């Protein structure tokens, strides 16, 4: 019985445990669901709450007010209903209200007590008093009266009081009321405006324009600010010389874009009216445009005055890149009512609407740093940050030799200014400009209509601010003229401030007179261009001699233009590289500033020169490429049959003696080697591109192209990055590219070719070992000859004989390889006679009559036989020509004169005999990539720079440069291979 009970008990325990586990798991799941739900709640705003609800700033939702309560004006707490007073107030909504008794229905202004009101109640349940009276609820000691009283303020002489704005006490009337009407009222015939009282007996204009003009939008707005305060401000400034009123009047003129129209009495016309009326007063700080008690708004409207202000007097201080390199701009700031706020430095983004770190914002005032800042800001942010405009008078602070501090006024060029309805400041001639002084950034007040508490209909924003600093010509100490602040405003018609935005830009640019630099560049271009013409004429004359044509025809003119394009490309390249290095070295290395970088507009001529250099170099490159893939070439096989063999004759059933055929494989082998060296270069193109990119992007040489004085290769991410100068980018890129290219060429010539591999000389050796010579004509009567005739008589031999022949050569047991006995000269430049060329062409016509050798196997037997006969005929003719067999087409060998080598032309004309010029420099490489490395290197460099100047991206430029290198290499290989197969009868299928 006991044994049976224990299992049942155990089963019961397990069942209970399982149920408990399931319950706990379910609770956890429900808790997780509950926790997930509390992360989301309804979105409510204070204005969506009901009248009997307030907005709980903790729960961010609407909550009900207590009994006899309603929400306050802000909507974040509760107040008692009219007729109820507070008996408890713990702040916010925690109040308790109690109804006032019937005999005391009024509530005191503080809301804590009930009081009897003899003159009735207001809508809020407070006591009401007639006009000119103040409400008295307590006696002098502060005790509450049983009944409120209304006391009349004494407006008579000796008192001149009236209720204050709250109606709680009597205050003295505004002085203009007392002075004008000897009372606190301003009745006819006096004029009351803007809370002031003026007499109408003066000569102040009555017809005022309170309309704000928005030229960009083509509309006008009836500004409530101007309606309320323009006349009063102008009158107070005119009649009383009130300082703040005069400042406020000046602010209104600035808000109206400093525009002047002689036919309307707007803010600026009123300011000029007051300004002219103060002509008898002394000028402030000896400035004729700054009258006493008035702000300095204008420089005057005399023609040419702007040019004098900006270009006549240098600042009495100097700047450098190493010491005093900060522009200390300060601003006198005023509020819209004309009150002086404070002196403040413009650092920290005072004039910059775009947000950024203080370090980057302040970089705008580092001397020599070209600054550019752009952003897009929502109108809602501008309205929130600038509810009222702040006005600035900008000055440059400097110290003299004895460390006394002075201010230099900064003129403003307002592009929105209209003078008699003309935008004079948008004219290209500075003689027509009208300079001003005061600026603001955002005006959200003048665009308010009917009520100053309304959202403005139009907002005016300074969307473009540019500070121009010009260097004094020929200065050595960093002297500058007066900086110019150019500002342009945009008028935005507000539809939805949260969805609308405006683009803002702030820039600081430096300029100097580039006339001398342009003149020097033009002189260099003229001199070098003249030398290029002379060089092209010599090349054309040499070409005419090499083609054996004395006539000047259209082909000659075209050839001259092609040569001139190549030489002129070199001229432009030299000038642009020299110009770029000049700016890079002199700008970055100077301490006392004497030069400043050209501005982007001034760089256009330089960019044009680079474009011309690239276009002409591309034309030269294509000219050379086409010349290389159309050369005439033939491989002369000197191998002779070694004997005769018996050969079966088809169709005759017998045998006969036949010459042992010479193997064609040696010719195929030489042809393949020639095909391989067609695009061999003295540099590695991929290494060139990658190394250049490494130094520019990784090492940081591209930072030298920034338009700032720093020469550091590394920049912190927290630092401001100035825009790039296209001239400096070009200078840095060309310098690095040329240095890497020259280092590669020197390494290739001094080390690689000496100790590892020299493909050009190896090819000449291969020709000798293969018993094959190369006859090459790059022009009709000019070309190259590689003498490959074996000194051993035969090259088609076994390994043992080949090694023995090499040993005999090494031990000088045989004759030398040269064409002339007992010499080593194997390479020659050849100038062939016209007779020899004609004979060559007759044989060559038979050789190339078919459409290339690629279809040898599919050709008919007769055609193949004719081609083979033509090949043997050409081989026999050229071999006999080299062996002086044809006396009528003989040749002689000589050395070229030094002047001939320098000019690249031949003075002697091969009339009767051809001329072989000894050529130890292997100049036959000029028909290969190898001999045109300078052209290829400069072409690749110019391609790289043109792409970078277009897109400002070294990575993209590197990729596209390598891509074009590979494309042209493929074209050169493919077409050159087809030409080789066509001219030599080597089947293209054997060129691997």
UniProtKB/Swiss-Prot annotation:
Transmembrane segment boundaries: 517-545, 556-587, 601-628, 668-698, 729-768, 924-949, 955-982
Disulfide linkage: 49-62, 65-78, 80-97, 100-114, 117-127, 129-150, 153-170, 173-184, 186-197, 237-246, 253-268, 354-375
Intramembrane segments: 668-676, 677-685, 686-698, 729-754, 755-759, 760-768, 924-926, 927-933, 934-949
UniProt xrefs under InterPro entries: Growth_fac_rcpt_cys_sf, Meckelin
GO cellular component: axoneme; centrosome; ciliary membrane; ciliary transition zone; cytoplasmic vesicle membrane; endoplasmic reticulum membrane; MKS complex
Extracellular-facing ranges: 36-516, 588-600, 699-728, 950-954
Keyword Transcription: no
GO molecular function: filamin binding; misfolded protein binding; unfolded protein binding
GO aspect biological process, one term: positive regulation of non-motile cilium assembly
Subcellular location: Cell membrane; Endoplasmic reticulum membrane; Cytoplasm, Cytoskeleton, Cilium basal body
Residue numbers on the Cytoplasmic membrane side: 546-555, 629-667, 769-923, 983-992
Alphabetical UniProt keywords: Cell membrane, Cell projection, Cilium, Cilium biogenesis/degradation, Cytoplasm, Cytoskeleton, Disease variant, Disulfide bond, Endoplasmic reticulum, Glycoprotein, Membrane, Signal, Transmembrane, Transmembrane helix
Primary location recorded for the protein, binned into one broad class: membrane
First and last residue of the signal peptide: 1-35
Quaternary structure note: Homodimer. Part of the tectonic-like complex (also named B9 complex). Interacts with DNAJB9, DNAJC10 and mutated SFTPC. Interacts with SYNE2 during the early establishment of cell polarity. Interacts (via C-terminus) with FLNA. Interacts with TMEM218. Interacts with WNT5A. Interacts with ROR2.
Annotated PANTHER family: MECKELIN
Annotated protein name in UniProt: Meckelin
Organism lineage: Eukaryota, Metazoa, Chordata, Craniata, Vertebrata
Gene that specifies this protein: Tmem67
